[in-house]
Structure formats: structure tokens, C-alpha cells
Swiss-Prot record:
InterPro entries: ATPase_NBD, Carb_kinase_FGGY, D-XK_euk, FGGY_C, FGGY_N. One of its GO terms (cellular component) is cytosol. Signal peptide: none annotated. GO terms for biological process: D-xylose metabolic process; xylulose metabolic process. Coiled coil: none annotated. SUPFAM superfamilies: Actin-like ATPase domain. This is Uncharacterized sugar kinase R08D7.7. CDD domains: ASKHA_NBD_FGGY_SpXK-like. The keyword Transferase applies. GO terms for molecular function: D-xylulokinase activity. It comes from Caenorhabditis elegans. Its EC number is 2.7.1.-. Keywords: Kinase, Transferase.
């Protein structure tokens, strides 16, 4: 391989790397799990996080140690000296708080010592609030009141105020921990925090992740300064300016060259949020829907115009002159599916046998299943069933419970895709990524519910892949647009809708919507 381009995804449960060559072919993938890796077990996380009621965090130093481990692995396997570009992404919305003087430590990194050794004391907040946190209801209400309500916040920033969004999380620290705030020199998103490590100075926040903070004017793509002043008079100086996601942030710091052998002219692009990076990795066409099936489930698609919706999000697009990315995020994804599997004492490779015990439509057994407080709809955790009690469904009919979970998740995705205004065409497809994209039963239900073919990408991890693809694109200096350069040819057809099931789900969807409308009013 002559030239390599590295994409990295710092997600909730793991850090994942994908390397592509000069032709765009995936040549290497690797992943490190935060909770199960021998060197990271000491942090005591469960699925990468610490939970204390509605407060959900991850240790910053755990991420840094994982990055150390990842790059040691890449060096030992002979990949680092071939890298020409690096980019990537991180779980969206989470914030990292650098102590006063921390940038000096970044600039002076010593190649004889690990990152963790040198940066452990550089953070005023040791455990970063992440996207799963729901402890900021008070701050959300105050922010929305300030701008004139949830609809006005959505018109201004692309989303109503959400618990996990950075504005509410920052305001909570300003309100409750003034001493910590005074000791904070810089606030990074997790994405710009990662880029900062690579370039040896504070990296700027880029537009796609910046649009997921409730602080950026989505139309002008500039910070909304009245919101800054409402939170804290010094917030603007601690966040810095915004940068376009396809603009180079410079080359790797000499630390990475001397310690890991990365060429000194290796370019670093801004790191995105994981969902916009998945959009880049999937190379979606305007007629496609992207669905990421992970700890959380997300549905996203390209939209040429800005249409605010309090139930969804609109983010800036990573590519110039490409409109917006519409998205809805469901907090309860893979962990709820795993609960259904465990209730049936099954493994995923035998899951189709469990699902075949019940028919499509589940004899009209419907439920809403939230292991954590849900984002959309904004409802507390719990199992909400209608045709029979939750306990009866789980104890007497675990197979019906399992199908109810899977079908409910798919029906929610259809409901909110319609709310976001997606227009289906004859050539529309669903492109699925994430850990559950290998679950053929789930993919078939999605296909039947949406009445669309479902495709998967050839490599697991579209978010990391998106970082590598963007890096290669910028390095090429091509005059083609991103979609021209990457014509979405790295996908495989997984399943087609089954006409008999389509009819069943069309009828079930009407009942589902009725149950949903009643549920929302409660």
C-alpha cells in the first residue's frame, strides 16, 4: 500500500479504526472495547459508561488510554508509516473540559511517555457527560424559555433543547460548579478533543458537530451569541470559532511521528459527530435513508432545505453546498434488543428460530420499550404494553415480547421518518450500518415496514469509514463533488420487502400510530 487514510470512531462502547488505501479499498479494521479490554477494565464501565441515575458519563482518561492502545496496535502491525491523512468522529454532543494551562501539555507532548501519563491531570471534569445523560431538564427548560419555546429553538439551532445537547450540559456545570468552570480553559466536543490530541493544540469545533449543541444558528452556521451570553459571558472564548469539516486542521504533532512513525506531513481533518460521519461513510443518495443500529439507533437522510421539527434534528452537511442532514435519534437501541434476546435465552445466530415462533404483526401485540429515558418520544424509561400486561408478555410469551420489541423499534423509525418529511421514490433504499446490521431478522422487518429494499455496506462501521473517506477525498484535491467521487458502490443488497408482510405492517402501523397518539398525551 502506497498511501493509507485512517478513520477513527470514538463511540460509546469502543474505539474503532478503518484504513483505506489510495484506491478507497478497506485494508484494515480494528476495535477496542472500553469495558472488556484487559487494560481498560480498571475504569469499571458498563458498556463504556458510568451511570448514576440520570447522570451518565465516561472517564476522559479511559478514552485517552484506548487511543494509546489503538495506535500502539497500528504501529506494531505496520500501518502508521503509510498514513497520509487521518480523520474520524466521536459520539455526538458530549463535552470535554480542559483545565487552565492544558494546551501547554498538548504542545509539549514527550514521545517517550504515553498520552495518558502526560494528560491525566489536564481536565477540570474527569468524567465527561455523554449523549445518554438526561439530567439537564431544568437547563433545557431555561434555554427554551430564553429563545421563546421549543419550536423557536428548533428554528434557530435545528433542534429543540435536548438533555444530551452541549448547551444544557455546559449550563449545568456553569450553574452548579462555578469553581470547575473557572478552572476550565477550553471546552471541546469529544470530536474536537480527539483532533486536539493529534495536532497538539486545541482543535476547532466543526459545523456538523457544532450544529448538535443548541448553540449554532443552523442557517448562518455561526454561533448564536445571545445564547452564549445567557449561559456564561466567557463561553465564546472557551469554545472558539467554528471551522468547515472539509478544511485541514494541519499536520500531526511531532509526538505522533516520533512515537508511532506517522509521517510528519500526515494531514488531520476535523473530526465530525458520529452520525454525520456515517452519512459520509454510506455516501447516501438524496433518495436514500441511512439507519445506524447501535447503542442508540439513528435514522438520517439528506434534505436540500431546512425544515425545523421539534421531534427531530437538522444538522449541517459535511460537504459544501449539500443542504442539511435530517436525523432522529432513539436512545434505546441495541441494549433493549439484547434484553429481548436474553429473555428468550437465545444467541443472535439462533435468533431467527425465536422470531419464527410468531407471525409478522405479532397478532397485534404492540408495546413501547425504553430501558433508559427515551429522547423521542421524550418519555421516562419503562415498558408500555397495551394488549396485555408487561409481566404477562415477558413471562408467558417471551417470544411475543421479542417480536414486539423489534417491530416497535421499526415502526417508530417509520413514524419519525414520515414526521421529518422524507419523500420515498421508486429507487429509494435503506442503507443500514452499526452492530445490528448483521441481524437479518431485524433487516427484514425494516424492509417490510418501510416497503423498501435494505442494503448493508461491505465494512462494519460506516462512521469510522466516513473519516477515512473524507480524508482521502481532501487529499486527492479532486474537483468532483463528494457524491461524484464516491458513487455509493460499496453496498450489498440484504433483503427486499415481502408483499404479504408489507400489508400486515401497513395495517399494524395504523394501530401503532393510534397507540402512540394516546401515549403522547399521557
Amino acid at each position: 500500500m502506497k498511501d493509507g487514510f485512517l478513520g477513527i470512531d470514538l463511540s460509546t462502547q469502543q474505539i474503532k479504526a478503518v484504513i483505506i488505501d489510495q484506491n478507497g479499498k478497506v485494508v484494515h479494521t480494528t476495535a477496542i472495547n472500553f469495558s472488556t479490554h484487559e487494560k481498560l477494565k480498571k475504569f469499571g464501565t458498563e458498556n463504556g459508561v458510568h451511570k448514576n441515575g440520570s447522570v451518565i458519563t465516561s472517564p476522559v482518561i479511559m478514552w485517552i488510554e484506548a487511543i494509546d492502545i489503538l495506535f500502539n496496535d497500528l504501529r506494531e502491525n505496520g500501518w502508521t508509516d503509510k498514513l497520509r491523512g487521518i480523520s474520524g468522529c466521536a459520539q455526538q454532543h458530549g463535552t470535554v473540559y480542559w483545565k487552565n494551562g492544558a494546551e501547554n501539555s498538548l504542545k509539549g507532548l514527550d514521545e517517550s511517555r504515553s498520552l495518558a501519563e502526560q494528560l491525566e491531570m489536564c481536565f477540570s471534569v474527569q468524567k465527561s457527560p455523554i449523549w445518554m445523560d438526561s439530567s439537564t431538564e431544568k437547563q433545557c427548560q431555561e434555554l427554551e424559555t430564553f429563545v421563546g419555546g421549543d419550536q423557536e429553538m428548533a428554528k434557530l439551532t435545528g433542534s429543540r433543547a435536548h438533555h444530551r445537547f452541549s448547551a444544557a450540559q455546559i449550563k449545568k456545570i456553569v450553574d452548579e460548579k462555578q469553581d470547575v468552570w473557572k478552572d476550565t480553559e477550553k471546552v471541546s466536543l469529544i470530536s474536537s478533543f480527539f483532533a486536539s490530541l493529534l495536532i497538539g493544540k486545541y482543535a476547532l469545533i466543526e459545523l456538523t458537530d457544532g450544529s448538535g449543541m443548541n448553540l449554532m444558528n443552523i442557517k448562518t452556521e455561526n454561533w448564536h451569541k445571545p445564547l452564549f451570553d445567557f449561559i456564561s459571558s466567557d463561553l465564546e472564548s472557551k469554545l472558539g470559532t467554528l471551522v468547515h469539516p472539509m478544511t485541514s486542521t494541519g499536520h500531526v504533532h511531532s509526538y505522533w511521528t516520533r512515537r508511532f512513525g506517522i509521517p510528519s506531513d500526515c494531514t488531520v481533518l476535523p473530526f465530525l459527530g458520529d452520525n454525520p460521519s456515517s452519512l459520509a461513510g454510506l455516501s447516501l443518495l438524496p433518495t436514500d435513508i441511512g439507519i445506524s443500529l447501535g447503542t442508540s439507533d439513528t435514522v438520517f437522510f439528506f434534505t436540500p432545505t431546512f425544515e425545523p421539527n421539534i421531534d427531530a434534528h437538522v444538522f449541517s452537511h459535511f460537504a459544501p453546498n449539500s443542504g442539511y442532514m435530517a436525523m432522529v435519534c432513539f436512545k434505546n437501541g441495541s441494549l433493549t434488543r439484547e434484553r429481548a434476546r436474553n429473555l428468550n435465552n437465545s444467541s443472535w445466530d439462533k435468533w431467527d428460530k425465536i422470531m419464527k415462533k410468531t407471525p409478522a404483526g405479532n397478532d397485534n401485540y404492540i408495546g413501547f420499550f425504553f430501558d433508559e429515558d427515551e429522547i423521542v418520544p421524550r418519555k421516562p424509561k419503562g415498558d408500555y404494553t397495551f394488549e396485555c400486561s408487561e409481566e404477562e408478555l415477558k413471562n408467558k410469551h417471551p417470544e411475543k415480547f421479542a417480536r414486539a420489541v423489534f417491530e416497535s423499534q421499526c415502526l417508530f423509525k417509520l413514524l419519525y421518518t414520515q414526521k421529518m418529511g422524507f419523500k420515498k421514490s421508486d429507487c429509494s433504499r435503506i442503507l443500514v450500518t452499526g452492530g445490528a446490521s448483521r441481524n437479518t431478522v431485524l433487516l427484514q422487518i425494516l424492509s417490510d415496514v418501510f416497503e423498501m429494499p435494505v442494503c448493508t455496506i461491505d465494512v462494519d462501521g460506516s462512521a469510522a469509514l466516513g473519516g477515512a473517506m473524507r480524508s482521502r477525498y481532501v487529499h486527492s484535491k479532486t474537483t468532483k463533488t463528494y457524491s461524484q467521487y464516491y458513487p455509493c458502490d460499496n453496498v450489498s443488497l440484504a433483503c427486499q420487502p415481502i408483499s404479504a408482510n408489507v400489508e400486515v405492517y401497513s395495517n399494524l402501523f395504523k394501530t401503532f400510530k393510534s397507540r402512540f397518539d394516546e401515549f403522547i398525551k399521557q
